[in-house]
């Protein structure tokens, strides 16, 4: 546990000292407030823009960065020769990316939630199943491609599918906050378990299941590779 906490601190230090992370923390809340004040977007439209369309590709780059630190170097090839649990290595790097992403997302959501209201936070929580699916897809792509570039390509393809494939996905569309019926569920005016909202619950469960399946597939892949 001590070794894990040290590695977490090292990863967070690497991330926090990068120009990209500081730029993201500063610019995203400012851009969100400017867009909202322009009168072009409502709160649900803005939440969809930030959490469903922008934060998803942002999460892809964070996961890719976390895995590239080890996977794109000779360290990983040396690591798998030691009698260690390879699935723990995989889940540890996944946990690092989750800690970084959610920490930054919370930091960004604080000013937006304070200015725009609680719907911003609720929209973020509602989108978490999509992040789980996207993360699992990126990790599986990384293991299949044996390089973080494989995960990056898989993540971009997944992001493009949810961004432009709404007509094809229909009720499995990942971008839902822009719809009035979903907005009412997220805001608490309606309930998940009502008959007319059951498709929304199935939609979220689908993405949770997809994330779990992809992560399990990645674990099998890394164990098979190192066997």
Can you describe what each PLM-predicted range is?
Residues 46-70:
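Long, hydrophobic alpha-helical segments
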Residues 122-150, 210-216:
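Hydrophobic alpha-helical transmembrane segments of polytopic membrane proteins
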Residues 28-36, 102-111, 156-167, 182-184:
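Aromatic-anchored segments of alpha-helical transmembrane domains
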Residues 154-227:
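Terminal transmembrane helical anchor/hairpin motif
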Residues 65-99:
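Helix-loop-helix units of permease transmembrane domains in multi-pass membrane transporters
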Residues 91-117:
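Hydrophobic alpha-helical transmembrane segments that constitute the membrane-spanning cores
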Residues 1-24, 227:
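Aromatic- and glycine-rich beta-strand/loop motifs that create alpha-glucan
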Residues 35-46:
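Short, hydrophobic transmembrane alpha-helix segments
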């Amino acid at each position: 546990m001590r070794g894990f906490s040290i590695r977490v601190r090292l990863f967070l230090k690497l991330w926090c000292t990068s120009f990209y992370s500081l730029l993201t923390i500063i610019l995203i809340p400012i851009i969100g407030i400017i867009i909202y004040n322009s009168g072009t977007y409502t709160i649900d439209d803005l939440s969809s823009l930030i959490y469903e369309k922008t934060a998803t590709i942002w999460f892809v780059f964070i996961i890719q960065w976390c895995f590239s630190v080890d996977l794109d170097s000779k360290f990983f090839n040396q690591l798998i020769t030691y009698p260690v649990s390879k699935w723990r290595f995989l889940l540890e790097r996944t946990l690092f990316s989750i800690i970084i992403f959610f920490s930054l997302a919370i930091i960004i959501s604080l000013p937006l939630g304070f200015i725009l209201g609680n719907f911003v936070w609720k929209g973020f929580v509602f989108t978490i199943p999509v992040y789980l699916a996207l993360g699992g897809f990126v990790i599986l792509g990384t293991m299949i491609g044996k390089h973080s570039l494989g995960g990056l390509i898989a993540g971009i393809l997944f992001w493009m599918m949810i961004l432009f494939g709404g007509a094809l996905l229909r009720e499995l569309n990942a971008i839902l906050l822009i719809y009035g019926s979903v907005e009412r569920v997220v805001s608490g005016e309606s309930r998940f378990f009502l008959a007319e909202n059951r498709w929304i619950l199935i939609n979220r469960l689908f993405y949770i299941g997809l994330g779990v399946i992809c992560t399990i597939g990645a674990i099998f892949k890394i164990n098979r590779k190192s066997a």
